[in-house]
Every structure is written in C-alpha cells, then in structure tokens.
Amino acid sequence: MLSLTIKGKARRRKERAFGDRDFLTFSSKTKKTENVNLSFEKGTRFFDRGGMIFGPSPRSARWPIGIAAFGLCLLFLIKNSGSARESAGNNRKEGVHVAAASAPFLVNRAAGSATTTKERIHFKITNASAMAACGMAGSDLFGYIIQVESGVTGTAGLMENNFHGSVQRALFSLRILRSLRVNSLARIQNFWGPSIPSSSPAKTPLPFGLNIFFDSYMWAPDIYEGSPTPVTAFFSIAPERSISANILRVFIYGSYGATLQQIFFFCSIALRLRSTGAMANEGKASSSIGQLDYGGLYFVLVLMWNREGIQSLLIGLFIYASMDDRCFAIVSALRQTRVKYIADLGALAKTNPISAITFSITMFSYAGIPPLAGFCSKFYLFFAALGCGAYFLAPVGVVTSVIGCWAAGRLPRVSQFGDRRQFSVHRTRSLPNQLRHGWECMLRKIGSSLIHQPSVYSISLYESTITTRDEPWFGEFELALGVIGLPVTAHDRILRCSPPVVGTTRAGPGLNSER
C-alpha cells in the first residue's frame, strides 16, 4: 500500500447555460522510497451528479412567481381594507349583522337571529383548523433546526427560505378564508364586492385565482434543501393535506354553481408551467408542484358544486399522500448509503432490486401511467371535468400530464440502468482522525456560509459522501491518503480506488502512474 500526499486547488469556471462548475487540479508528492506520481489533466472536472431527489424548484421559476404573488397579495389587502369597511357600513344600514370589517383574516362567525348554534360551531371549527394548518405550515423552522443540529444540511439561507415559504403559505390559506364570508342570511359576502344571494353565482376575483395557482409553486419543500429525512416527509406532506382540506370546506359554502372562467384560465397556465418547468427541475419537487396544480382543477370542480369533483379531490389527495409516503420511505431507508442525489440512484437495481422496483413504480404512478393508482386519480379527475363542461381544461391537463411523464421517468431510468459514478478514495488506516475531521469541518464551514442549494459534486473519503456547494470555494487542501489502487476508468475522468490486488497497481488511461 502506497502512502501519498495529494494537494488540491479549487477554482470556478462558468459554462454556458448549464451554470457554474467547480474544477479541481491535483498534484502529488512522493514520500521516502515510495515513488508514486498521480496527476490529473489540467482542468479535470468532477462528474455532474444531477439534482437532488427531493430538491426544490429552480430559483429562476420560484422568485418571479413568488414576488409577483406576494406583491398582488399586499396590494389587494390594502384595497380590501377600504372596501370591507364600506361593505360592512352598507350592511349595517340594511340591518344585516356582520362581523367587524377591521378584523382581518377571520371567517365571519357573527350570528344573526337566523343563525343556529350548529352553524356557529361549524365556523369555529373551520377557523381553528385553518389556524392549525397555517401554524403547521409555519412550523417548518422547528423541523429544519432539527436537521441542522443533526448535521444533515446547513445553509445561511435558513431565515430567508423559511420566511419566504411559510409566509406565502400562511397568506394563501388565510386569504381564502377571508375572501369568502358567510353571514346569517346564508349569503356569500365577497370582500371585492357587495353581498351576493346564494342563488347567483359567486364572483371569483382576479387576485384570488392568482393566489391559488401561482402560490402553489411555494408549496414545494424548498427550505429542506432536499434532505431525505422523516422530518422533511412530515412537514412537506401534512401542511399540504391540512390546507387542502380547509380549502375544500370553505369552497363548498362558496360555490353554488359558479362558472369560474378566471380560475380555468390560471389553472391551465399553471399546468403548462409545471409541465415545462419539470423538464428543468430533475427532482421530486416538480411532481409536488404538478399535483398541486391538478389540485387546482379539483377545486374548480368543487366550486362548480360537482359531486364527482369532490370525490375525485378526496381520492386524489389520498393517492398522492400515499405516493409521497412511499417515496420518502424508500429514500429514507437508503440514507445509510448516502442516497441524496439523482446520480446516487445509479445501479440501485443491482444493490437493492426491491427498493429500485418499488421506487420506479411509485414514480410511474406520479406520472399517471396506467394501470397505477396515479392514473386512476387523474382519469377520474379528467372525466369529472368533462362532465362539468370544462372541455378546454381537461385536454390541457391530459397533454401536460403526458409531458410530465418525461421528468418523472428520469429517476426510474437512473435507478434501473444508471451507473453509480463517484469520485472516491476509500479510507485507510493511514488517514488520521484529526485530518479526517478537519477536512469534514472545512467543507461544512464552507457550505454553511452559502445561500444556494447543495452542489452536484462529491468526494468520498471514508465510505461516505462529502458534498461541496454550487458556489465558489477557493483554496488549497492537503490530504495524506493511503492509495490502494489507482483508477481503472478514465471515461468520465473520475478517480476510483478499488480493493487492493496483491502485487498490482492499476492506472487508467489519461493518468500517469509510476513505481
């Protein structure tokens, strides 16, 4: 076994539209009588590991949509504060008792002479459950702190991401509860206009549709940076289900046969954005966004007071929750092998065939391929939409679902036919513990000072994966490693060290090896 000191220097270089890539240049020193030279070609690049399996949506898509939705939300909150007071004053003149307009974000629980105790209890439960849903959406901070303390991931963008995601979700849920108010005369009180009798269709304002279908892009598990942990699974599944259930309960009272062309329009736009954005985002977050866009179609059917639409919503939520649980369970079970990035799924069919088959079936169900459960939910949804007269929206959903199959099929393809490529130098006894911990702490310190998501590069030193970030980190490092065998492959210019072969030292083409 050869003892070797490897020096490395990191630099950054931009490459067209594919983003920035880190390059490492190595040199070596010989020690005593062991004369081994190991050198890479100048500018040798680590392979691209792909995005994270549970990675967030691209910032290029999140930020414009999030800023636009948040700005519209603030503008119409200011507008509503004046219109709500005016509407409340008109109602007092007419003798209609409503809740004070100065109390924002509350469902009207004020009871007139015709309001029953059962109605009061129902709206109290609705308000309490909505607050619980928003609290769960805002409690992401606790789950994230748990992960940071356990060393799963770290980032300086903790407060920025947590504020951005939690506030958007809370405002989204609370505005829905505020936009539809039910008074004692069983009339729909709209903050953007006068009271509407129950026999007439309810108006759905423009910002309401924007909040529904544009804020859904903020529901992806952004703040977790794709960490496949049980905490991530809970806080990414439970708030969505809770908020969806509360929206359903409120929308049933605000429907009464409305034909909502605005929501049809924004739902079709959201479906198209999801199908095209998923091609850029390789992770499961695109599947989460897509299911929420189909959830917008569910709520359109509920607003049209369609019984099949309500049934399809409940079936779709149940099936999607089960697929989420299964997908997180599979990836969490593979945490011991450091499966976090898409490239880590390579050769999973050889090492763990049962998990690979289950994971592939789950992702195909996300895509809606028959005869899996995901196809059944979408089939039920599209036929319910056709039965309600949504002859334009249903074909759009079918086409975008077919386009989304390409993105959902990438993970099964890598797990079944991919090759696990990794720059690895297995640990030997010649690697001191102090040096090993120092190297790990250096990377952790570098990573925690960055805002962007983890990079796609890794170095495996002692049967684990240490990742750098997609940000420039400059400097030199020096490691004393026991080189067991020099690399045997040079197709991707990756250094691999295999178990020792007695009396042999192997080197791949493109690398110089001397004894």
Swiss-Prot record:
<keyword id="KW-1133">Transmembrane helix</keyword>
<dbReference type="Pfam" id="PF00361">
    <property type="entry name" value="Proton_antipo_M"/>
</dbReference>
<protein>
    <recommendedName>
        <fullName>NADH-ubiquinone oxidoreductase chain 2</fullName>
        <ecNumber>7.1.1.2</ecNumber>
    </recommendedName>
</protein>
<keyword id="KW-0830">Ubiquinone</keyword>
<keyword id="KW-0812">Transmembrane</keyword>
<keyword id="KW-0472">Membrane</keyword>
<dbReference type="GO" id="GO:0008137">
    <property type="term" value="F:NADH dehydrogenase (ubiquinone) activity"/>
</dbReference>
<keyword id="KW-1278">Translocase</keyword>
<comment type="function">
    <text>Core subunit of the mitochondrial membrane respiratory chain NADH dehydrogenase (Complex I) that is believed to belong to the minimal assembly required for catalysis. Complex I functions in the transfer of electrons from NADH to the respiratory chain. The immediate electron acceptor for the enzyme is believed to be ubiquinone.</text>
</comment>
<dbReference type="GO" id="GO:0009536">
    <property type="term" value="C:plastid"/>
</dbReference>
<keyword id="KW-0679">Respiratory chain</keyword>
<keyword id="KW-0496">Mitochondrion</keyword>
<dbReference type="GO" id="GO:0005743">
    <property type="term" value="C:mitochondrial inner membrane"/>
</dbReference>
<feature type="transmembrane region" description="Helical">
    <location>
        <begin position="250"/>
        <end position="270"/>
    </location>
</feature>
<feature type="transmembrane region" description="Helical">
    <location>
        <begin position="299"/>
        <end position="319"/>
    </location>
</feature>
<feature type="transmembrane region" description="Helical">
    <location>
        <begin position="379"/>
        <end position="399"/>
    </location>
</feature>
<keyword id="KW-0813">Transport</keyword>
<keyword id="KW-0249">Electron transport</keyword>
<feature type="transmembrane region" description="Helical">
    <location>
        <begin position="356"/>
        <end position="376"/>
    </location>
</feature>
<feature type="transmembrane region" description="Helical">
    <location>
        <begin position="63"/>
        <end position="83"/>
    </location>
</feature>
<comment type="similarity">
    <text>Belongs to the complex I subunit 2 family.</text>
</comment>
<keyword id="KW-0999">Mitochondrion inner membrane</keyword>
<dbReference type="InterPro" id="IPR001750">
    <property type="entry name" value="ND/Mrp_TM"/>
</dbReference>
<keyword id="KW-0520">NAD</keyword>
